[in-house]
Each structure stands twice: as structure tokens, then as C-alpha cells.
């Protein structure tokens, strides 16, 4: 059904917050990598729950597709408008609504950026642990994909810090789930159902988040190894040592070299084949003791060195390279980002498989990621392949990679979500009964199937989405 522009204008009267047709910027109609494109008839910037509710009520009554969007940093095409309709951009709903220091919670709107929330609470002696690599991502987006990041090995992921949500269902109904209480054994946990649903079940309008005290001290350590296998195997020993690291990252030397050139800095021990980058936080004496324990274990298990990054400039440079690895690869060639997760004990097996696949196929695959939780980030590099060859070889190799991940007990995504790019692999590898249950929940909450249709687990609507 064609949009009734006058109806939308009655909901959002400010012409600067309602764009249509050719006035919609191109970046709103593609993914952040610029590879998947869609189209929409309207782009709305609501400022309140009431406006979101009114827009969804209109869309539900007239069966108009709606694509929720936060900061637009998603890497798997979750915010691409596949079926036209309305893009619902929540980026201007970005306020802190309440800081409750007694319950150690903060209530924010979904458009607030992660980096702004972290700065706000840390200035007040508090700490929001989830730490996805893209600091300019939105809190609503983080919750919608259950984003994790480097601190997940110690602190957990976004789901672990959501106490409550205000959401708007597809028909405009406003619903509160969760609350400031610590325990809740009352009925189904609707909050957990909505977290990670990628905008397919409801639109988040308020986020009640759990905070912890800001750590007193923090220390990062760079541990070089001759090869990646030795480094990954030593991680299991470190994790069993009760040293409680905040982050345990692994990087192959070949991707670090790209990051060094991109950032204009150098890592120590360029003779290494891989690096493990760790952080410890907590009380000063606890940090010192844990680092000393890990130093001994690492050197006993093949580490070439144990470099404490006590110099603030050096530490910042080392972490800047780690944070820029995807962009560093992208600067050299188009690439496909992957964030498969396997059991920690199978991380080395999966990387061994990927290295073999790279050698067999001739397609470069550089790996890094969160060794502490088995989340492997791959950059699959296009190189000089023409479009037809790139698409064919990419999908052939990704079919094999995802199949191996599932064989090892893993899943398609640790933190990016399924969106479009992982959808074909997810649908093939997920049990029919699970998909039927997910789609039944979708139909119950969104009977018209207007919210972010064709994404993630959905098997209705645009069934061809996700192949690009």
C-alpha cells in the first residue's frame, strides 16, 4: 500500500524529521559496507515513545514495512530496508533519562551511543562493561544484536546488563519488560526474548541497564607467540588459572601488519607469528597478582615474551591497531566480515580448518578475535576477483566454514547478529523445529510481518534476502 504522507506528517510535523523519496540519503538505504541496497519511501526520526507508537500503529493498520535503525553500524545488513516502507531512525532518541546510584542502574534512550554512555557513567565512578569494537554503535542496536566485545570473557555480553526495556510492538502497543529488581521468577522472560531479535519483534524505546563499580586499576599485556596454534592453546591454560582476565584477544601477524600500516604504529616482536593481547582490571593488587600468574603460565607454554603495556601511549597504540583491523583489511581490499563462535576448546581446531581452507581455495582469510570466548573474526579478502568469481567462491567457502563451525558445536554469530549476510547459512544449519518456533513467536507479536522482514531467522516475506 502506498504511504499516506499526510498521515505521517500528522505524527511528525517537523519536516526535518520526516524525509521522503529522493530526500532520503543513500547511506540509509544500504548497509554500512555499501554492498547491500534497498529502498524506502520515508525516513522518520522520532523523538519519543509516543511518536514511535503512532508510526507503528499507522504501519500496522496499513501493512507498511518498517525497518528500525540505530547508528547504522551493523555489519550484516540488518538495517537495510528490503521491502520499502518506513525507516525508523532512533538516533535522535539519545538521552540519559535516569541514573539511579542506589540500584546501580541507568535508563537511556536507544539512540545513545556506547562511547557516550561509557564516558557518562565512568565520570561518576561507575562502569558499563559491554564493549563492542564499534564504540559509535547505539545502545539499542547493541541490545538488538546482543553485542559482546572484548570484555565478554570476564563480564559477559549486552544481555547480562539489561535489567529492563520499554518496547513498542508492531501494532503500536507500548510494553514494559523487566525492572530494577535483581530477581524475577514471574512468568516468561519477555526481556530475554526481545534481546538479540534484531528489530523483528518490537522497537526498543527505553533501556534500563545494570552498572558495576568502575575498576580501580587496569593493565594490558601483549604476549607474542611463534604461531597461532601455540598462542590459542595457551589461552586454555590461562583461563583455567583463575586469573580472571578482562580481555583475551588473538591476532595473526599478517593482519597485525595490515593494522600497523593503517594506523602508522608498530607492534613489538615483529618476528612473532601471532599475538595474544590481554587486559586485567580490578583492585591494584589483584591486577598485579593476576598478571604475574599469567606471565609465568604464558612463558611456560611457548610465549616468546610477556610485554606489560604500562606506558599509556604504547598501550593506546596497541589497542588502536586491534580496534582498526577490519578497517585495515578493508583499506586494502573488499572483504567479508565473519564472527563465527565455537566452544573455547575448539577455537584452535576451527582456525586450523580455516587455514587449510585458505590454502586449498587460494582465498585469503585473516583471523583475529576473542580467544577468551571462542569468537573468531575472519576477514575473507576479495583481492582481484571479478564480481561473479568473488560471489561464487565466497559462498562456497563460507558454506564450508559455517558447516565446520556447527560441526564443532558453534553457531553463525557471536555478536554481529544474522541480518542478511549470514541468513542463508543460519537457515541451512538451524533445526527446522527451532525456526518454526521463532517464526511462530514473530507471527504472534507482529501478525502483519511489518518489522524488519526478511532478516535473521524469518522464513516469510522476502525469502531470497541474504544472498548478495
Q: Across the structure, where does each feature detected by a protein language model lie?
A:
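Noncatalytic alpha-helical scaffold of FAD-dependent oxidoreductases
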Residues: 1-468
Amino acid at each position: 500500500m502506498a504511504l499516506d504522507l499526510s498521515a505521517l506528517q500528522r505524527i511528525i510535523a517537523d519536516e526535518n524529521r520526516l524525509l521522503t523519496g529522493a530526500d532520503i540519503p543513500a547511506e540509509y538505504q544500504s548497509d554500512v559496507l555499501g554492498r547491500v541496497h534497498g529502498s524506502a519511501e520515508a525516513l522518520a526520526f522520532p523523538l519519543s515513545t509516543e511518536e514511535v507508537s503512532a508510526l507503528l500503529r499507522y504501519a500496522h493498520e496499513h501493512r507498511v514495512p518498517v525497518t528500525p535503525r540505530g547508528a547504522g553500524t551493523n555489519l550484516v545488513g540488518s538495517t537495510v530496508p528490503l521491502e520499502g516502507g518506513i525507516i525508523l531512525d532512533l538516533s535522535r532518541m539519545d538521552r540519559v533519562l535516569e541514573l539511579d546510584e542506589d540500584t546501580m542502574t541507568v535508563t537511556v534512550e536507544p539512540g545513545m551511543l556506547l562511547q557516550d554512555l561509557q564516558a557518562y557513567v565512568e565520570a561518576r565512578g561507575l562502569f558499563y562493561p559491554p564493549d563492542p569494537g564499534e564504540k559509535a554503535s547505539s545502545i539499542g542496536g547493541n541490545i538488538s544484536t546482543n553485542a559482546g566485545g572484548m570484555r565478554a570473557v570476564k563480564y559477559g555480553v549486552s544481555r547480562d546488563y539489561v535489567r529492563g526495556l520499554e518496547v513498542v510492538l508492531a501494532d503500536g502497543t507500548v510494553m514494559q519488560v523487566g525492572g530494577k529488581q535483581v530477581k524475577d521468577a514471574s512468568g516468561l522472560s519477555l526481556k530475554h526474548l526481545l534481546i538479540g531479535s534484531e528489530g523483528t519483534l518490537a522497537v526498543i524505546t527505553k533501556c534500563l541497564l545494570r552498572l558495576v563499580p568502575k575498576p580501580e586499576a587496569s593493565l594490558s599485556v601483549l604476549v607474542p607467540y611463534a604461531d597461532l596454534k601455540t598462542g590459542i592453546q595457551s589461552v586454555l591454560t590461562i583461563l583455567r588459572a583463575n586469573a580472571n582476565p578482562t580481555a583475551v584477544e588473538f591476532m595473526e601477524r599478517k593482519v597485525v601488519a595490515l593494522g600497523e600500516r593503517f594506523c602508522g604504529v608498530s607492534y613489538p616482536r615483529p618476528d612473532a607469528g601471532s599475538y595474544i593481547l590481554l587486559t586485567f582490571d580490578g583492585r591494584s593488587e589483584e591486577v598485579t597478582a593476576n598478571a604475574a600468574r599469567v606471565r609465568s603460565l604464558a612463558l611456560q607454554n611457548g610465549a616468546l615474551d610477556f610485554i606489560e603495556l604500562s606506558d599509556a601511549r604504547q598501550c593506546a597504540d596497541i589497542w588502536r591497531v586491534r580496534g582498526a583491523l577490519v578497517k585495515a583489511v578493508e583499506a586494502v581490499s573488499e572483504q567479508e566480515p565473519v564472527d563465527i563462535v565455537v566452544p573455547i576448546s575448539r577455537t584452535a581446531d576451527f582456525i586450523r580448518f580455516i587455514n587449510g581452507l585458505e590454502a586449498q581455495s587460494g582465498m585469503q582469510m585473516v583471523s583475529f578475535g576473542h580467544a577468551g570466548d571462542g569468537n573468531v573474526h575472519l576477514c575473507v579478502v576479495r583481492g582481484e576477483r571479478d564480481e561473479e568469481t568473488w560471489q561464487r567462491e565466497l559462498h562456497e567457502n563460507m558454506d564450508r566454514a559455517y558447516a565446520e563451525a556447527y560441526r564443532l558445536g558453534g553457531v553463525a554469530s557471536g555478536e554481529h547478529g544474522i541480518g542478511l549476510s549470514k541468513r542463508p547459512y543460519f537457515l541451512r544449519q538451524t533445526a527446522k523445529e527451532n525456526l518454526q518456533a521463532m517464526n511462530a513467536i514473530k507471527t504472534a507479536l507482529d501478525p502483519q510481518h511489518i518489522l524488519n522482514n526478511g532478516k535473521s531467522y524469518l522464513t516469510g516475506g522476502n525469502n531470497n534476502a541474504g544472498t548478495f
